[in-house]
């Protein structure tokens, strides 16, 4: 008897957690977009744990830091993720002054 009651309570608790989750998704479209972007970045392997999630993406805060004599601007939130992605891209190879292509 107690096992069935415990299973029933656990099932009710799981149902309530699911309802709370879906309720928060439906009432907060910004959180849906944020979770979508986080999922995409995570799938691409570009999510960084050093960048804290922003509470409002409309006004990102800027913090200036000095690293070995150079000034950098660190942004928080969505724009910081985009700039981090852009910074991680490899540089294009330098132009070669070698032999030009051949015309047939």
From Swiss-Prot:
Residues 1-81 form a propeptide. Residues 48-104 are annotated as: Disordered. Residues 63-74 have a biased composition (Acidic residues). It comes from the Eukaryota. Pfam families: Pep1_7. Elicitor of plant defense. Belongs to the brassicaceae elicitor peptide family. This is Elicitor peptide 6.
């Amino acid at each position: 008897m107690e096992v069935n009651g415990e299973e029933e309570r656990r099932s009710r608790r799981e149902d309530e957690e699911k309802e709370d989750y879906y309720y928060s998704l439906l009432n907060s479209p910004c959180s849906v977009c944020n979770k979508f972007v986080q999922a995409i970045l995570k799938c691409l392997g570009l999510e960084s744990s050093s960048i804290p999630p922003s509470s409002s993406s409309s006004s990102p805060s800027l913090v200036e830091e000095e690293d070995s004599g150079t000034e950098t601007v660190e942004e928080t939130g969505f724009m910081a993720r985009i700039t981090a992605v852009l910074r991680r891209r490899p540089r294009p190879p330098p132009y070669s002054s070698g032999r030009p292509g051949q015309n047939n």
